[in-house]
Amino acid sequence: MKCLLCGQTMKTVLTFSSLLLLRNDDSCLCSDCDSTFERIGEENCPNCMKTELSTKCQDCQLWCKEGVGVSHRAIFTYNQAMKDFFSRYKFDGDFLLRKVFASFLSEELKKYKEYQFVVIPLSPDRYANRGFNQVEGLVEAAGFEYLDLLEKREERASSSKNRSERLGTELPFFIKSGVTIPKKILLIDDIYTTGATINRVKKLLEEAGAKDVKTFSLVR
């Protein structure tokens, strides 16, 4: 099997635990590539997992004042290796890379068995240009289904806006007509920065009747 990132041939090593549990190590990364990604450590904001903090961060305090209780979890930091990954996956359109973190996501998402998964959608133009929704790809590669509840209108890319600009614009997301809103939702995105997108959509779902909305991203 070859590493999906560098193409290096990987040796399959059967460990005692994998034999005992009758499962294979299904990692798509070689050890060299795997070592370039940084897991979020224990020192982080208890609400959004912002690193190198042990108390609620400033962003979460601001969200609290706006009536949003942040309850977010993520796996990795947004280091240079992760930036390079998303450059290839999202912007170069290498859809095969959706499988790179499948085993990591599977381990985390299985903790939310009582929740219905909902992914942050792309606008029609962005979807047409990219050819796929990168979040849907990650979730599907991890072996999970999601509900199609949301749509997004066209707008300027959020990555080109600062926090105040994101909050000052009308929310481009809306709930599709005729759908049933589950009581417990895990809202999933690829990257969490200030939380401007995912927390506003969280509030939208809560106002529509969801009783418990938690948020999740691959990267913080």
From Swiss-Prot:
Keywords, comma-separated and alphabetical: Competence
Domain free text: Oligomerizes via its C-terminal domain (residues 94-220).
Record family assignment: Belongs to the ComF/GntX family.
Species, as recorded: Streptococcus pneumoniae (strain ATCC BAA-255 / R6)
Gene3D superfamilies in alphabetical order: 3.40.50.2020
Protein name, per record: Competence protein ComFC
Subunit comment: Monomer and dimer in solution. Interacts with ComFA and DprA; ComFA-ComFC form rings about 150 Angstroms in diameter with apparent 6-fold symmetry.
Keyword Transcription regulation among UniProt keywords: no
Gene deletion effect: Over 1000-fold decrease in transformation efficiency.
Record-linked PANTHER family: DNA UTILIZATION PROTEIN YHGH (PTHR47505:SF1)
Transmembrane segments: none
Function: Involved in transformation (genetic competence for DNA uptake).
